[in-house]
Amino acid sequence: EDELGITFEPDIDRLVARSDIISLHCPLTPETDKIINADRIAQMKGDAYIINSSRGELIDEDALIHALETGRIAGAGLDVYTHEPAVDSRLFDIPNVVLLPHLGSATFEGREASGERVITNIRVWADGHRPPDQVLEGWQ
């Protein structure tokens, strides 16, 4: 910690209250659903920013919108949204938010791997077998 100039804070409420920037990088689980809620947003510093490039449901979007509209926090950067692919239209008119179209996986390697999976699925299906990534049961 000293070498990196950081301090580990195991208590999320203290972490939220002390942080200048909160950047979410965790999976969506029952424990993390709306981990950033109205109470935690109220604890944030007025000049704090929140960044979410993980899962939209990690943030209570209504509470975040209210905090952004009222200036309760300085701003937000969002790459994911609660009801993807839809984005809450209230976010479009808020000047202190940056909205991205879920670019977190948009690396060259990620796109290449996705393309390879598509090709594999098509080949398997064309050979009369069930594609490994088939989503709809019973589809032929």
Regions found by a protein language model. Give the residues of each.
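C-terminal helix-to-coil terminal segments
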Residues: E84-Q140
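Rossmann-like adenosine-cofactor binding region
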Residues: E1-R90
